[in-house]
Amino acid sequence: NRNRGHDKRDASNLGWAISELSRVAILLNENGRDGSAFEAAAKPIVDIVLNGIREDGAVGSVWDGKTGAVVTYNGDGAGFMLMGLARYHALTGDERILPVIERAFDYYYSHDIDNFRCFGGAMDCSSIDKEGIQPFFTTAKYMYEQTADDKYLEYARKAAWYFASWIYIHNPI
């Protein structure tokens, strides 16, 4: 893990944390239980992330765990962050979220997905992978449901093509 021994937080893990804390809160709330503790745990992470997104939409890939400042913007794990923000929006309706997701998604679509590359979940390197596209697909679906903007259908279609390009079919006969 590239962050071992350092007080750094990466976008993949922060995004997953927001996503799963929000998911648990939603499930608890839907089943008559109190999910507010999970929502409260996600909120400070969301606030740090929203403060670290550049004007062009780039999402920080590593944050300083003590100060909350972005250490680098190299793109790793941005999809996981967008997925987390989408789940948090589904939980809270926080009006700050959708414009940020839109700006960031436009950035990563034009810089990465439309160029048929995606940096994802590996914590030990910055490399192109297949896993990193899934949260973009999930977020595109959510954004289409929220906005009815057809561009998110195109984003989802391109994400699906990218993922399918990793499938290797072996026929030994």
What are these regions (language model features)?
Residues 1-173:
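Glycan-recognition and catalytic cores of secretory/periplasmic carbohydrate-active enzymes
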